[in-house]
Amino acid sequence: GRYAICKSATAAKDQTYALYNLTQHQLAHTLMPVGEYTKDKIREMAEEIGLPVAHKPDSQEICFVPDNDYAKFIEENSNCRIDEGNFVDKYGNILGHHKGITHYTVGQRKGLNLALGHPVFVTEIRPETNEVVIGENEDVFSNRLTCRNLNWMAIEDLGAQEMRVSAKIRYSHKGASCTIRKIGEDRVECVFDEPQRAATPGQAVVFYDGEYVVGGGTIE
C-alpha cells in the first residue's frame, strides 16, 4: 500500500494543493489531526483551552511577507536583480515599460498602467528577455500544459498509460477534468476537457482522483 492525503472537510481551507510534494517517507511520519474539523470548530476548541489565537483574524497575505510586497521580498532575499523592461505584444511590438517581472503574473489585468483603449492581460513572462507579454483575455486560456519535477502520491508512477484526473493549477482553482500522460522520464502532459485560465509556469499543478491526491508537478 501507499500513503496518500485526501481533501479536508472544509474545501475553502483545504491544504492538499500545497502538500502534494510530500514523499512516502514523510507521509509515513506525518499526522494531520485537524483535517476533519472546520475552522470554526478549531477556533471553538482553542477558546475552550484558552489559546490567545482563538479570535485572531484570518490572514489574507503571504504569511512570511507581512506587508504583502512579495516583489520587494524577492529582491531583498535573493540574488535576483529586478530591472525594468518592456511590455510587448505577441508579435514583439513594444507597448510600454514595466517595473520588473516579479511584479506580474499570468492573467493579471490590474496595475499594468497601460492605456490601450481596451482591457489587456499578462499572457506570458519571458525572464530571458525581461519582457512581459500582453494580450486579450482569450489569450490567457489554454487546454494543455506540461509539468516536470513530478511527485506521485496515491500511485507509484503513471507508467505508459493515460489517466483521467481532476487538476488544480492554483490554490484557489476548483479543479478541472483532464487526461494526463507521461512524455518523458520526469514530464507529464495534461490535456483539459475545457480551456483553463492562466496556467502559470512555476506554479504547481496537482492531480486528484476523487478526494485523493494522485500527485503533481511544476508547470513549465
Short names for language-model regions:
Residues 1-213, 218-220:
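Nucleotide-activated chemistry modules centered on ATP-dependent adenylation/adenylyltransferase
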